A protein has these predicted regions:
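Alpha/beta-hydrolase fold active-site neighborhood
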Residues: 45, 56-58, 320-459
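Catalytic-loop region of hydrolases
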Residues: 2-15, 26-187, 192-195, 226, ...
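Active-site-proximal cap/loop segments of hydrolase catalytic domains
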Residues: 170, 176-235, 446
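A catalytic-pocket lid/entrance helix-loop region that shapes and gates access to the active site
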Residues: 172-184, 255-318, 363-373, 383-387
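Glycine-rich nucleophile elbow surrounding the catalytic serine of serine-hydrolase chemistry
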Residues: 133, 226-227, 245-259
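Alpha/beta-hydrolase active-site loop signature
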Residues: 130, 163-166, 207-210, 249, ...
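Alpha/beta-hydrolase fold nucleophile elbow
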Residues: 236-248
Length: 460
């Protein structure tokens, strides 16, 4: 299934800068409540069924602590300039078999600027997804603002590619060039035949994941990524973890805090995912559709308030009408032959995700309404010549699918999906069906699906 038209959970820095100063410099956000675990894994908060993994991560962390990280200048292809340094941390593919197959996780860092006397340790970042790379974190925040400069005095900034992502044993589910081809089918089905076609694509995508990355799939889970985090912590020589997670990264942080409560020093979470096990992940995506609709309306209100600039209407209803006209036009004949409703949703989806995208998207939309179709085509159409970018997009989508589908059990009965999304679409049409097709491979996922951890949260 080719799904590059839908971007996944935000992989961004968002408003985390303010949280870094308020929290990292002052104190910790409460970690998820859990009982402490001895170093050998006995009495682990999830000892029943998790004994092997608990012991495995202890073994892997001890190895990593001895090995450390062989920091070097980053490979030119990573586009991470000096003084950022890069390296790898070795972890087991399967923590139940710590002496079995190993994979390497890419990490990078930039040292704290305040000297040894001010240093409070390493700050490890996850941007969300799942499927987002954190390697750009040190480069993007260094010198970005006074807020980050203050945190940089005390912390080494550390990024990493989670397992399966980028330079860390990357997985794939489809040919990247086929993955990005456009236009895709309209996500909103007009008939039962449309639904059958989308179901077929979802089933084929799940099969492609197994064919291309079958060995990795059973181990592409949030708990395993949390275990990887603990091994990285050990490799860095840190007794406790300082962590910043955004969007999905907040769930990763919650799982880490549940598995390793004694290893948490300070933890900052921004744009929080509800970690309740009955939400992960089917219900969470339905809830996300509701949130998207609310944010979509907020953007439309902002556009209407700035009608003197964008000329898209001075009420939300008028802006929505312009959107529906655009969508109908693209459904009838894709703009430039490549931008249909799916590509439009992918482009406009950034508005609900990021306030910083509001003005650029409104400006492009305004140009279209004024007669400049090409500006919108250039912004929304895939670039088939960008082979590296397309490979990255396909990889990110593969990891997203693998983690969410393997993390938890999903409905296997199509009638459940059809009922829930048909109902939800009536009042929340912007993303509902696009999100449904994005996740439908989980209904026919070819490897065993796990039961989410019972993340017990405490007061923050």
């Amino acid at each position: 299934m080719s799904k590059s038209s839908i971007r996944r959970r935000a992989t961004a820095f968002g408003s985390a800068g303010a949280l870094v100063t308020a929290t990292l410099m002052a104190g910790a956000v409460s970690a998820p409540a859990a009982s402490a675990a001895p170093a050998d894994g006995r009495g682990h908060p999830h000892a029943r069924g998790w004994d092997k993994e608990a012991r495995g991560v202890t073994i892997a962390a001890a190895r990593a602590a001895r090995a450390g990280v062989d920091w070097e200048d980053c490979d030119a292809g990573w586009n991470l300039p000096k003084p950022i340094q890069c390296g790898y941390v070795t972890v087991p593919l399967d923590y139940a078999k710590p002496f079995g197959k190993q994979i390497k996780l890419a990490v990078d860092r930039i040292g704290n600027t305040g000297g040894r006397s001010e240093r409070q340790g390493a700050l490890i970042y996850n941007p969300g997804g799942p499927g987002g790379s954190g390697l750009r974190f040190p480069a993007r925040v260094t010198g970005k603002s006074a807020v980050w400069a203050n945190a940089a005095k005390a912390y080494d900034f550390v990024g990493f590619d989670p397992r399966g992502v980028g330079h860390s044993a990357p997985i794939s589910c489809a040919d990247p060039q086929e993955f990005v081809k456009a236009p895709k089918a309209d996500p909103v089905p007009g008939s039962e035949a449309d639904k059958l076609a989308q179901r077929k694509l979802a089933r084929e995508y799940a099969e492609g994941c197994f064919e291309r990355s079958g060995e990795m799939l059973p181990h592409m889970t949030t708990p395993n990524t949390a275990r990887d985090l603990d091994v990285i912590r050990a490799a860095l020589g840190e007794k406790k973890l300082n962590y910043l997670g955004v969007s999905y990264g907040t769930y990763l942080g919650a799982v880490y805090g549940t598995l390793f409560p004694d290893h948490v020093r300070r933890m900052v979470v921004d744009s929080v995912v509800n970690p309740s096990r009955d939400k992960i992940w089917y219900q969470a995506n339905l809830d996300q559709d509701v949130a998207f609709e609310g944010r979509w309306k907020e953007w439309q209100d902002w556009v209407a308030a700035n009608d003197a600039t964008y000329h898209l209407g001075d009420t939300r209803a008028e802006v929505q009408d312009q959107w529906l006209k655009l969508r109908a036009t693209a459904a009838k004949e894709p703009l430039g032959g490549v931008v249909g409703p799916a590509e439009l949703i992918s482009f406009f989806q950034s508005a609900p995700y990021y306030d910083s995208a509001w003005a650029p998207i409104a400006a492009t939309f305004s140009k279209y309404v004024a007669g400049d179709t090409q500006a919108l085509v250039d912004a929304a159409a895939p670039d088939l010549s960008d082979t590296a970018g397309n490979a990255s997009a396909e990889n990110g989508n593969a990891v997203y699918t693998a983690v969410e589908c393997t993390d938890a059990k999903w409905p296997t009965d199509w009638n459940t999906w059809d009922r829930d999304n048909t109902r939800l679409h009536r009042d929340h049409p912007f993303m509902t069906w696009a999100n449904a097709w994005m996740n439908l491979p989980c209904a026919t996922w070819p490897v065993k699906q796990q039961t989410p951890l019972n993340v017990k949260t405490g007061k923050g």
